[in-house]
UniProtKB/Swiss-Prot annotation:
This is Glucose-6-phosphate isomerase. It is found in: Cytoplasm. The modification N-acetylthreonine is found at T2. It comes from Mycobacterium tuberculosis (strain ATCC 25618 / H37Rv). Keywords: Acetylation, Cytoplasm, Gluconeogenesis, Glycolysis, Isomerase. The keyword Transferase does not apply. Pathway: Carbohydrate biosynthesis; gluconeogenesis; Carbohydrate degradation; glycolysis; D-glyceraldehyde 3-phosphate and glycerone phosphate from D-glucose: step 2/4. Optimum pH is 9.0. InterPro entries: G6P_Isomerase, G6P_Isomerase_C, Phosphoglucose_isomerase_CS, SIS_dom_sf, SIS_PGI_1, SIS_PGI_2. Pfam families: PGI (PF00342). The gene is pgi. Gene3D superfamilies: 1.10.1390.10, Glucose-6-phosphate isomerase like protein, domain 1. Belongs to the GPI family.
C-alpha cells in the first residue's frame, strides 16, 4: 500500500480557510451560537456504542466542522487510518506496524501482517491468559505453601502500570473471585515498601511486566520483591509466586520464572496502547476472562466506528479535530478531563500518557520541523472534587481550557440524600450539567446586578462563559463502556497526529534521560570525589546530594 506524501498542513488552502474562518467567528459567544441555531443542542451530537456525545457547547458552527473535515482529508486521514488497520508500518521512525486495534479483533477476523497471522497470535495469548487466570481464580493454582493467592502485585512502569491501575479502579465492582490487585511502578523504594507492608508472601503473586525484561525501574522493583519473597519462603517459591509479561524468555528464565508462565506481546503494541494486551493480566485475574472479553469488545465497537463511519459523523475524528481547532487557532494549551465518577479518578492520568507521549513531538514524520503547535496537555480530576480546586480558573481565568465531562446515568454505588429528594448520584450529575451550562453561557453583569449584588462586587462575580466543553454520557460504567471510552481517545490522538504530520507511535523523548541516569548512577554512588559534570548546575546538585548522603563531595 503506497502512501501519499505527508503535507505541511499549515501550508495548505484548507489551513488558510480555517484561519480566515477563525478571524470571522473566533470572538462569537456560545450564547450567540445557540441563539442563531437553537437546534444545535440536539443536532451537534453523536451516538456510538453506549456513548452519547454532545459537542454542541463548542465554539464551532456547521461551517467550522466542514472546514475541519476538509483539513482532515487534506492530511489524508482516511488513507492513514486504513493503513493503520491494515498493518502498514506507519510508525516510520521505528519501522513498525501500529496494531493495538488487532488486540481486540474477534476470533473469526482475518489479518495477516508481515506474513504473520496476527489474529491467531492474539487469541493464543488471550487463551493462555484465560487458562492461567481460571486456575488462579478457582484456587487450582496455589502458592508454594499451598495457600490460595489473594493478592496480585503488578510490577511495571509507564504503559505497563498506568493502564492497569486505571482500569482496576474503574472496574472494581466487577471483581468476583476474592483477588485484589496492587501496583508498583516507581523506583522510589517507598512505593514497593508501602505496597508489601501488610501482604502475606504465601498468598501474593507478582506479575512482572516488561517487554524486554530489562526496564531499569521494573527489574529493580522485581528483584527487591523477589528478595522479600525468598526471605520468607525460600528460592524455590519464586516459580509459584512470579509470572511475567514479556518477550525475553532467557531473562525471564534467569530470573527464576517458569517460561510456561510468560505471556507475550508484540513490537506493534506501544506501551500506552497495551492495557488490552497481556499487560492486562492483572485485570483478568481480578475480573475474569469473560469481563475482560467484554472490555475488549468495547474497544472494538469504537474501532469499527472509527474505521467505517463518514468523517462528518465519526466521533473520534470530530473530537480530535475540535481539539486541534482550539490548540492551533485559539492558542489553547491544555484540555481538562472531568469524569463525574470517582471510579474514573485515574482516567485523566492515563490519558496524559496516551495523548502527551503520542503527540508531544516537534519533528514531523518526514524529519522536518513541525510548523504548528502539537500535543494537547491533558489533566483533570473527578467531579465534584475539581470544582473546589481549579474550576475557578476554568470559569473566570484568562486561559481557554476546553473540558471533557464524562458521566453515567445509572450508578454502581448510590445513597439517598438527607432531603429525600433524590440520590447522591443525582446530586453529582446535577453538578455535571450545571458546570457545562455555566461554562458555556456564564452570567452577565446585568444579570448579577439584577440579583441585588452591590455595584462594587458585580465585576468580581461576572461569569463570562464561552468556555467550551464536550459532554459524554453512558448508561453505566461497564467493562465494555470503559473500552469504548479508551478507544474514543486513542483515535482522537491518531486524528490529531495525522493532521500535524507527526509519528504518534514513537517516544524518543523519554530515552535520553534514562541513558543519562545510568551514566550518573556511579557518579553519585562511587567512592572518592566525583568527576566534574558538563554544567555547573548538575555538578553542584550531584555534589550536594553526595554530601547529604555522607559521600565525598
Amino acid at each position: 500500500m503506497t502512501s501519499a506524501p505527508i503535507p505541511d498542513i499549515t501550508a495548505t488552502p484548507a489551513w488558510d480557510a480555517l484561519r480566515r474562518h477563525h478571524d470571522q467567528i473566533g470572538n462569537t459567544h456560545l450564547r450567540q451560537f445557540f441563539a442563531d441555531d437553537p437546534g444545535r443542542g440536539r443536532e451537534l451530537t453523536v451516538s456510538v456504542g453506549d456513548l452519547y456525545i454532545d459537542y454542541s457547547k463548542h465554539r464551532v458552527t456547521r461551517e467550522t466542522l466542514a472546514l475541519l473535515i476538509d483539513l482532515a482529508r487534506t492530511a489524508h486521514l482516511e488513507e492513514r487510518r486504513d493503513q493503520m488497520f491494515a498493518g502498514v508500518h506507519i510508525n516510520t521512525s521505528e519501522d513498525r506496524a501500529v496494531l493495538h486495534t488487532a488486540l481486540r479483533l474477534p476470533r473469526d477476523a482475518e489479518l495477516v501482517v508481515d506474513g504473520q497471522d496476527v489474529v491467531t497470535d492474539v487469541h493464543a495469548v488471550l487463551d493462555a491468559m484465560g487458562a492461567f487466570t481460571d486456575r488462579l481464580r478457582s484456587g487450582e493454582w496455589t502458592g508454594a505453601t499451598g495457600k490460595r493467592i489473594s493478592t496480585v502485585v503488578n510490577i511495571g512502569i509507564g504503559g505497563s502500570d498506568l493502564g492497569p491501575v486505571m482500569v482496576y479502579q474503574a472496574l472494581r465492582h466487577y471483581a468476583d473471585a476474592g483477588i485484589s490487585a496492587r501496583f508498583v511502578s516507581n523506583v522510589d523504594p517507598a512505593d514497593l515498601i508501602a505496597t508489601l507492608a501488610d501482604l502475606d508472601p504465601a498468598t501474593t503473586l507478582f506479575i512482572v511486566a516488561s517487554k524486554t525484561f530489562s526496564t531499569l525501574e521494573t527489574l529493580t522493583n522485581a528483584t527487591a520483591a523477589r528478595r522479600w519473597l525468598t526471605d520468607a519462603l525460600g528460592d524455590a517459591a519464586v516459580s509459584r509466586h512470579f509470572v511475567a509479561v514479556s518477550t525475553n524468555k532467557r531473562l525471564v528464565d534467569d530470573f527464576g520464572i517458569n517460561t510456561d508462565n510468560m505471556f507475550g506481546f508484540w513490537d506493534w503494541v506501544g506501551g500506552r496502547y497495551s492495557v488490552d494486551s497481556a499487560i492486562g493480566l492483572s485485570l483478568m485475574t481480578v475480573i475474569g476472562r469473560d469481563a475482560f472479553a467484554d472490555f475488549l469488545a468495547g474497544f472494538h465497537i469504537i474501532d469499527r466506528h472509527f474505521a467505517t463511519a463518514p468523517l462528518e459523523s465519526n466521533a473520534p475524528v470530530l473530537l480530535g479535530l475540535i481539539g486541534l481547532w482550539y490548540s492551533n487557532f485559539f492558542g489553547a494549551q491544555s484540555r481538562t478531563v472531568l469524569p463525574y465518577s470517582n471510579d474514573l479518578s485515574r482516567f485523566p492520568a492515563y490519558l496524559q500518557q496516551l495523548t502527551m507521549e503520542s503527540n508531544g513531538k516537534s519533528t514531523r514524520a518526514d524529519g522536518s520541523p513541525v510548523s504548528a503547535d502539537t500535543g494537547e496537555i491533558f489533566w483533570g480530576e473527578p467531579g465534584t472534587n475539581g470544582q473546589h480546586a481549579f474550576y475557578q480558573l476554568l470559569h473566570q481565568g484568562t486561559r481557554l481550557v476546553p473540558a471533557d465531562f464524562i458521566g453515567f446515568a445509572q450508578p454502581l454505588d448510590d445513597l439517598p440524600t438527607a432531603e429525600g429528594t433524590g440520590s447522591m448520584h443525582d446530586l453529582l450529575m446535577s453538578n455535571f450539567f450545571a458546570q457545562t451550562q455555566v461554562l458555556a453561557f456564564g452570567k452577565t453583569a446585568e444579570e448579577i446586578a439584577a440579583d441585588g449584588t452591590p455595584a462594587h462586587v458585580v465585576a468580581h462575580k461576572v461569569m463570562p462563559g464561552n468556555r467550551p466543553s464536550t459532554s459524554i454520557l453512558a448508561s453505566r460504567l461497564t467493562p465494555s463502556v470503559l473500552g469504548q471510552l479508551i478507544a474514543l481517545y486513542e483515535h482522537q490522538v491518531f486524528t490529531e497526529g495525522v493532521v500535524w504530520g507527526i509519528d504518534s507511535f514513537d517516544q524518543w523523548g523519554v530515552e535520553l534521560g534514562k541513558t543519562q541516569a545510568k551514566a550518573l548512577l556511579p557518579v553519585i554512588t562511587g567512592a572518592g570525589s566525583p568527576p566534574p559534570q558538563s554544567d555547573s548546575s548538575t555538578d553542584g546538585l550531584v555534589r550536594r546530594y553526595r554530601t547529604e548522603r555522607g559521600r565525598a563531595g
